[in-house]
Amino acid sequence: MMGVNAAPAARSDPVSMAPQLYNKVSDDGWHLSIQIRGEVVNSVPNLAAAANSREAFVTATASATASGGSSPIQESLFILGYQLGCQSDVSAGLVVGGTAGIAGSVGLPSASVGGSVGAAGYVQTILQPGVIVDLPMTNMALNSAGRATLSVDNLHIKADACGGDVNIRSYAYFRISTEAAHTSYAIYGDPIKI
């Protein structure tokens, strides 16, 4: 008995991404720093083998610090996440339809017989412009020493119903609030196709 085995889907090697760092001084004198380091993106074949779905596993560490300000920090938020860009949104799905028919004829007096067969069909989808979504992975507030560290290790990212390329990029968002000012800023990793 002979069988046909499909070759396994190609698998990419994990990619180490460049570290990112951004320092800033707020209007009320806080020295702020955020960074992303140790980022690895492992793009893998889609588990369902769907042609319009992409998957990856991500690892990254982000840290934030705040020091030297004149007004105490009343509230803070630090987020590590990913942005995912889908080239074309095909979530409306496919519509398949058609018609078919058979027609016959008989001619007299020559006793001729004839017939015809016809079919028409279509496949239709609604292509919408690409979309970009935020995928916050984890968050926390600064501790009493003005520090926060966030880590994700081998977390799953997936995109379904995407026609064309799917790209992701990491981000770290940092916000502090004092009586004198509210400061928000972010850094972004390099985009990578998954």
Regions found by a protein language model. Give the residues of each.
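Secretory targeting and sorting signals
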Residues: 1-12
